[in-house]
Amino acid sequence: LEFRRVLFRSRVLLITDAGMPTVSDPGYRAVRMAIDSGFEVKALPGPSAVTTALALSGLSSDRFCFEGFAPRSEIARNRYFEELKEEERTMIFFEAPHRVCEFLKSAALVFGEKRPASISREMTKTHEETVRGSLEELRLWSESKEMLGEFTIVIEGLDRDSLEYSDADLARRLKDLEGTGLSRRDAIAKLAKELRISKRRVFDIAHQ
């Protein structure tokens, strides 16, 4: 209510000492209130950890998504990553220093230890640092030193063309699809299309 009164009396400038205002930041509520009250809102381009970390990562920037902060608890975090397991775009996250190691542990578990990623901290500041490698390599790195500063983590999206599935993996996935009520024929077709593999291979596994 007080902020709304200020809007009607003067020009308001929203600034922050922690990156771009309103990006994974409660400042968006002030912007929404101004818009809802009929005020004109303008943005001055400034530094953004999202695009800066992406540029430093060396990972694909053709398509990317910003996911903010992952859940704090291990169970919720793992479940959250499971929802992103099929994401093909490069993913960008923010994380607090005391949770970086646990974040990487969960990410390696769900996305795979070999998934390429990068970690950037203190960007545009004196102690700026970017470390690149697999999720497992980054996890080991995070355990070997004290985590200080604000972190932005970039993880490569799923590359379906490079995936390798064992017969056991395909058999389990096929069983799961049939468990949803699909006929075996439809389950075979759906699995082959989703994983971009031949129907013949899935058919042979289904009839072993």
Where are these regions (language model features)?
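Acidic beta-strand-to-loop metal/phosphate-binding motif
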Residues: V12-P21, M91-E95
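Class I SAM-dependent methyltransferase SAM-binding "motif I" and its flanking Rossmann-like core
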Residues: R29-E87
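A contiguous loop/helix-start segment that scaffolds small-molecule binding in enzyme catalytic cores
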Residues: R11, T90, P97-Q208
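General beta-strand structural signal in soluble alpha/beta enzymes
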Residues: A43-G46, F93, I119
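Short, hinge-like loop/turn segments at secondary-structure boundaries
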Residues: F8, V31, S57-D62, V110-F111, ...
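Glycine-centered tight-turn and secondary-structure capping sites
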Residues: P26-Y28, R184
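Short, small-residue-biased leader/transition segments that mark boundaries at the very start
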Residues: L1-L7
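Acidic, metal-coordinating catalytic cores used for nucleic-acid/nucleotide bond scission
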Residues: A18-P26, R72, P97
